[in-house]
Curated annotation (Swiss-Prot):
Its main location: cytoplasm. Homodimer. Its EC number is 3.1.26.3. It is an enzyme of class 3 (hydrolase). Belongs to the ribonuclease III family. It is found in: Cytoplasm. Transmembrane segments: none annotated. The keyword rRNA processing applies. GO terms for molecular function: double-stranded RNA binding; metal ion binding; ribonuclease III activity; rRNA binding. This is Ribonuclease 3. Digests double-stranded RNA. Involved in the processing of primary rRNA transcript to yield the immediate precursors to the large and small rRNAs (23S and 16S). Processes some mRNAs, and tRNAs when they are encoded in the rRNA operon. Processes pre-crRNA and tracrRNA of type II CRISPR loci if present in the organism. Residues 154-223 form the DRBM domain.
């Protein structure tokens, strides 16, 4: 049995029903009669509302579109995996030996899903306000500067606006290669403008690599 008391201490929440926490920590590969997918579904909805309400009050003058971008920057696999890592959540997840040997304890998708499942479990046992308090504490701890300019790093849109305005061209993003094991896949992206390569970047997803390449291009153009 994993020492889930350590996890409860990190969460600052002690489950009355320990089986509910174990349920939230059980990945589908563990081959039990239950897994955390349904709790993940619930936790995802709770976190979406928690973050939406938080941003609504924190950025009272911002338009709906900006709030949606902010929420998308916080409510995603990468952000939740970061929070999960701060809790050492991978050490507590129940999964098959095969999944663990395949890097399952470090997979952002598994970590993110488990975090959502835990929030869903807290909501079930203690109610929305309790889940909200814990979720916000974790978010603020891991993202101390919740600021639009910091979170919304949409370099692709900014670059496109500049290039279309100045030369009437839209940047193109080409996948040069994908490499590495499945759980640590890397993508190399080349940013092409008017048939010429302007920048190149490597990241763990195509979207992230495209954003990095766009940032490099903006720096070259003196727009950052």
């Amino acid at each position: 049995m994993k020492n889930i008391e350590k996890l409860e201490q990190s969460l600052t929440y002690e489950f009355k029903d320990k089986n509910l926490l174990i349920h939230a920590l059980t990945h589908k590969s563990f081959k039990k009669s239950y897994n955390n997918e349904r709790l993940e579904f619930l936790g995802d909805a709770v976190l979406d509302l928690v973050v939406g309400e938080y941003l609504f009050h924190k950025f009272a003058k911002d338009a709906e579109g900006d709030l949606s971008k902010l929420r998308a920057a916080l409510v995603n696999e990468k952000s939740f995996a970061k929070i999960a890592n701060s809790l050492n959540l991978g050490d507590f997840i129940f999964m098959s030996v095969a999944e663990e040997n395949n890097g399952g304890k470090e997979k952002p998708s598994i970590l993110s899903d488990a975090l959502e499942a835990i929030i869903g479990a807290i909501h079930l046992e203690a109610g929305f306000e309790f889940a909200k308090t814990i979720a916000l504490r974790l978010i603020e701890k891991n993202f101390p500067q919740i600021d639009a300019k910091i979170l919304i790093k949409d370099y692709k849109t900014k670059l496109q606006e500049i290039t279309q305005g100045k030369i009437g061209q839209t940047p193109q993003y080409e996948t040069v290669r994908a490499f590495g094991p499945d759980h640590l896949k890397q993508f190399e992206i080349a940013l092409m403008l008017d048939g010429k390569e302007l920048a190149r970047a490597i990241a763990g997803s195509k979207k992230e690599a495209q954003q990095m390449a766009a940032k490099i291009a903006l720096e070259k153009l003196g727009a950052l």
